[in-house]
Amino acid sequence: MTFEDLRQKLKSGEVSSKELVQEKINRINELDPTLNSFLIVNTELALSKAEHIDKQIASGDHLPPLSGIPIAIKDNLCTKGIKTTCASKILDNFVPPYESTVTKKLLNAGAIMIGKTNMDEFAMGSSTETSAFGPTLNPWNITKVPGGSSGGSAASVAAGLCYGSLGSDTGGSIRQPASFCGVVGMKPTYGRVSRWGLIAFASSLDQVGPFANNVSDAAEILQVISGKDELDSTTVDIPVPNYLETLSKSIKGMKIGLIDNCFDHEGLATDVKESVLSSASLLENLGAEIVNISCPRFNDGIATYYVIAPSEASANLARYDGVKYGFRAEDEQSLIEMTSKSRALGFGSEVKRRILIGTYALSAGYVDAYYKKAQQVRTLIRRDFDDAFKKVDVLLAPTAPTTAFGSGDNIDNPMAMYLSDLLTIPANLAGLPAISLPCGFDKYGLPIGLQLIGNVFEEGKLFQVANQFEKAAEVYKNRPKTDFTL
């Protein structure tokens, strides 16, 4: 059921907003003790707002587009008066005094914030296993991870606990869990959506975007949250097009480039490769021209990212010292001891690992060899994309090299965990928009994600291609069973 379907049902009185919210709360109470996709459920607040919207509907008031629709928020987005933890012990009791720009825009559009979702601590992870509040499980198979870092946002949509959600994407944290959970996830162009109120991981890479069960709903959410924000100097003052108008456009004559580097990688699972290539054939049948294209430095993205992102994290997370807010170690005899102990006890092992990597990369004697060199390679990766978009409209690749891996399989193997973002990281380094949507299933019935990458501020083209594929393939109509048998 799309947002448009929900609007019609609300307008006709076939269903009330309170009934929609109560149904999702009941489902959360039934299923989330197993999944652990939510950290906070705003039961009273959500029902109260739903009642208010129902009164407005009954009065015939003109309402904004998302009125009465329950949407979940990743717990690294500040929500005024509602605890925001970043899934970390160090922020366990942090209640923001202000609202992030994107959540404010959603609320102004009438959306009902049903809760805050679980995530990898400080968005550092690819499996939602590094959360201080326990891992999230994949609703398609609870022995598998949902991906990360936005695993709670993806799993909650896939399991029908909300109609859409917000996540953040630094190296693939929207697209990879979207792939693992069989939903649509969009990472916008860097600067399209405000980061004001997003708790920073890597400021030159972070971007907020939507999860939804279908392309049109993802387009609606992005439409609402996009645009210039005076509170975020990195947002760009470029008009936001009407994404919904692009959905019905034919893709006949569009050039779509298969990034050949992706399909030659030894870590790419056979089921994933076959499904994505089959998807390319379907797009060709819909009128697109499919061409092979090379991005020579595409596979250098992961090494580049794991210098730049930890370096920025090292600087951004220096503010958590136990002094003004967050977790504070007790009974220490000096400020240095208190700060050291607060950080040692407050941060989890993966966060500490990345802080150490970043601090090392920025240290005297190594900054030229690592950080500056990584920034140079980042520029070369962007140039490869620039060259590619002179020849094609959209690029096509798998979202992830594999389907969802087993819970616990990679938690003690950082390199294996990091490689799951191999195919998503380049778009972040180049600041490009990219979308993941379900395109098939592996032999075990786990979802496979198709990734489309666009040129800067061309989210509309991605929605256009994605929607035409979605309508033709109808993969999105398959939903996970929720008896959660092993």
Swiss-Prot record:
The active site is at K74 (charge relay system), S149 (charge relay system), S173 (acyl-ester intermediate). This is Glutamyl-tRNA(Gln) amidotransferase subunit A. Its EC number is 6.3.5.7. Heterotrimer of A, B and C subunits. Belongs to the amidase family. GatA subfamily. Keywords: ATP-binding, Ligase, Nucleotide-binding, Protein biosynthesis. GO terms for biological process: translation. It comes from Prochlorococcus marinus (strain NATL2A).
